[in-house]
Amino acid sequence: MLPIINVDLDALLANEAPIILELGAAGKKDGRISIDHLNLPGVDIVANLEEGLSFLPDYSVDAIHSSSFLEHIDNLDLLMQEMWRVLKPTGKKHLFVPHFSNPYHYSDYTHKRFFGLYSFEYFSKSNYGFNRKVPQFYNDNSFVTESIKLVFKSPWKYRNKVQEEIWQANK
């Protein structure tokens, strides 16, 4: 699939403003170039990210954001290599993925992979202070992990609160 580029990418790259990508963005976020495989309103570049980011030159991107997208990708190795290729040496990537223990993660048939605490350490040279070291021979990426946040939210927390409030109201 050839990318459909709905923005003047050459002008954006020539500009001094930071280049910030939003991968898997079904809508436009201010100041970011949104990339998705669906040609929806607000999508700047329509591309199959399973094939990488070939439409971007090396070291051209200041930041990459991705939220609840990478679990839908088959070829994560290639996409991570492409992120490494297009990020500037001072570039940052901010990735949010659901933890494998999320009860809703298994119900979504479009989820193709699972992520745990150590998943992104396979793409990092930093080991982030974990006790368990992960193998570093799978790829040539040398991302440095600056922070990891693991959040567990109970899907029943608010349901129980509503039931409690209803019960209290019915006393």
Feature roles, as predicted:
Residues D77-L78, W84, K88, K92-K171:
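S-adenosyl-L-methionine-dependent methyltransferase catalytic module, highlighting the catalytic core
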Residues M1-A11:
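Class I SAM-dependent methyltransferase Rossmann-like catalytic core
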Residues D10-N15, Q168:
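Polar/charged alpha-helical tracts
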Residues D8, E16-S101:
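Conserved SAM-binding loop
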Residues M1, E16-A17, G31, N139-E146:
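Generic structural motif recognizing short loop/turn segments at the entrances and edges of beta-strands
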